[in-house]
């Protein structure tokens, strides 16, 4: 009798296991497609300054990536080595149309994306690690400021 109940429970659970695996594969394929097509938005949820504690971001901060433009609207917390020429502009708020975009796969199935703006003096480069489940982390290296990291997720651009 015990074996019959175990068999019934196993038959009920098996379709759910298969669906979960298919859903994971579909999400990975979708993330791969938007990364390779350069058509996505990185939504920052946590800022991790070099010095100090992490900060949860409550506003809609992000980095929009398309084939011809990168638009950054990210906050900065940290130390600046030189004073900005225009203090009303944020250090990570810029739009660039001239940039290098390099993508490579990493060992765990995700992607490493390096964006190097060429028509903006600061930041120097943005290095993003995108995981196959859609979560991502980004490090912003700057000439005149301490590096800062962000954790968040990647989604298709609307």
Regions found by a protein language model. Give the residues of each.
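Helix-rich interaction surfaces within compact, conserved domain-sized segments
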Residues: 94-158
């Amino acid at each position: 009798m015990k074996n019959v109940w175990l068999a019934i429970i196993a038959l009920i659970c098996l379709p759910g296991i298969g669906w979960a695996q298919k859903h994971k594969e579909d999400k990975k394929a979708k993330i791969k497609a938007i990364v390779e097509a350069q058509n996505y938005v990185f939504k920052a949820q946590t800022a991790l300054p070099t010095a100090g504690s992490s900060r949860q971001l409550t506003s809609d901060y992000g980095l929009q990536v398309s084939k011809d433009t990168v638009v950054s609207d990210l906050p900065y917390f940290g130390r600046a080595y030189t004073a900005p020429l225009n203090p009303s502009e944020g250090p990570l708020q810029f739009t660039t149309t001239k940039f290098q975009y390099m993508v490579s796969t990493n060992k765990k199935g995700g992607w490493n994306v390096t964006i190097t703006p060429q028509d903006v003096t600061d930041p120097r480069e943005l290095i993003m690690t995108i995981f196959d489940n859609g979560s991502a982390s980004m490090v912003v290296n700057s000439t005149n400021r301490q590096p800062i990291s962000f954790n968040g997720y990647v989604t298709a651009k609307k």
